[in-house]
Amino acid sequence: MTLKQRYQQAGKEASWALSLSILYVIGWCLCAYLPKETQGPIGFPLWFELSCIYLPILFIVIGHWIIKIIFQDISLEINDQGNQK
């Protein structure tokens, strides 16, 4: 992988990480402030269950799959073939 390809991959990974972070904050705000004051299935207020239990679990799963699909192992060695330019 050339140095240019490494930078492109790093930029792609950073974009995904930033997008997921922004999406998480938006999801947390929606889950915390939109539900009515009702009790959730496990006994906590619904807003708490959605924003502090279910949403983090969902994003852990999403993050795991993004790491498996999008992210790549990149060698940190500069002496790789094609990096001399």
Curated annotation (Swiss-Prot):
It is found in: Cell membrane. It is a multi-pass membrane protein. InterPro entries: DUF997. Keywords: Cell membrane, Membrane, Transmembrane, Transmembrane helix. GO terms for cellular component: plasma membrane. It comes from the Bacteria. The keyword DNA-binding does not apply. To E.coli YhdT. PANTHER family: INNER MEMBRANE PROTEIN, INNER MEMBRANE PROTEIN-RELATED. This is Uncharacterized protein HI_0974.1. The lineage of its organism: Bacteria, Pseudomonadati, Pseudomonadota, Gammaproteobacteria, Pasteurellales.
